[in-house]
Amino acid sequence: MNPVPAQREYFLDSIRAWLMLLGIPFHISLIYSSHTWHVNSAEPSLWLTLFNDFIHSFRMQVFFVISGYFSYMLFLRYPLKKWWKVRVERVGIPMLTAIPLLTLPQFIMLQYVKGKAESWPGLSLYDKYNTLAWELISHLWFLLVLVVMTTLCVWIFKRIRNNLENSDKTNKKFSMVKLSVIFLCLGIGYAVIRRTIFIVYPPILSNGMFNFIVMQTLFYLPFFILGALAFIFPHHKALFTTPSRGCTLAAALAFVAYLLNQRYGSGDAWMYETESVITMVLGLWMVNVVFSFGHRLLNFQSARVTYFVNASLFIYLVHHPLTLFFGAYITPHITSNWLGFLCGLIFVVGIAIILYEIHLRIPLLKFLFSGKPVVKRENDKAPAR
């Protein structure tokens, strides 16, 4: 069994927090991009579209690698049932809390903003269910995927641990070239599965719950397991924390391919399948770029960094309805896209931090948005002197 490191790896905490917080400029730039969203500016911005595409091309792949890393670390710390319970509580409770408090009001607001409130009664029962699935899960989809992955990894992590106990761990080494080939094959495999579903029964791909539970889990599970393997094998982790010009160049070329596919691809042809292959290998190479950068610059402890590490999930959860509110009611009054983008950042981040500070002072909300029980310190119980 792999021992749990005594020293906290601050750069991974920081990277995870920054990836979470990158969701704010990602969604605000989406308003000003050429991509169709719930709310859009009058004229799209080429540079904000490029910025949006860059974040979207790798952010969640790297995030799930870090999630897998910490999940396996906790897997070794707790008994199996307690591990599953702790992990599911920490992602499931915030997700279930955010649905009635955040995404339901967000959905109601959008119904009126987009003029769809009048047509809602005329929808079929399935259309109502599917619309609610997409709109209520919304930006919480990664929490649902983490619940599914944690449940699957009850079996997967047990198999990994049993195989380690019956084999020589020192001989299990992979080069970045070998990992690239593996992830290329995984991307092609995912593309084949998606194309097969598209041929056999295309309507299922527009089903919200199927998309989140099956397709998103299927795509990101290799990154989650890669994170676990990086925790187990120091050599694998070193592949990602050691700067590689090859990975940087390959990631840059893959991003160009991603942009070309976005520009010239067609949803009726092979655009989505091509994107899955590109983003699978791009995500792998960006793990090296992000980890090596973070290991060099973010591997330290500070009160300010710790604050945003702790606040990142809450800020991410509340930023989405704030962003849509800004896009619906404030964006139309700002003619400059870049000024609107900067104002959006100030508006969303400012209010999110205020809400975070308020929720810290309400124990029930603090529990509901973190999934962690509030533990009173012994000093708090001591009588005043």
Swiss-Prot record:
Keywords: Acyltransferase, Cell membrane, Membrane, Transferase, Transmembrane, Transmembrane helix. InterPro entries: Acyl_transf_3_dom, Glucan_succinyl_AcylTrfase, Glucans_biosynth_C. Coiled coil: none annotated. The chain crosses the membrane at residues 17-37, 60-80, 91-111, 137-157, 173-193, 212-232, 239-259, 274-294, 311-331, 338-358. It is found in: Cell membrane. It holds the Pfam family Acyl_transf_3. GO terms for cellular component: plasma membrane. GO terms for molecular function: acyltransferase activity, transferring groups other than amino-acyl groups; transferase activity, transferring one-carbon groups. Its EC number is 2.1.-.-. One of its GO terms (biological process) is glucan biosynthetic process. The keyword Transferase applies. NCBIfam families: PRK03854.1. Necessary for the succinyl substitution of periplasmic glucans. Could catalyze the transfer of succinyl residues from the cytoplasmic side of the membrane to the nascent glucan backbones on the periplasmic side of the membrane. Belongs to the acyltransferase 3 family. OpgC subfamily. This is Glucans biosynthesis protein C.
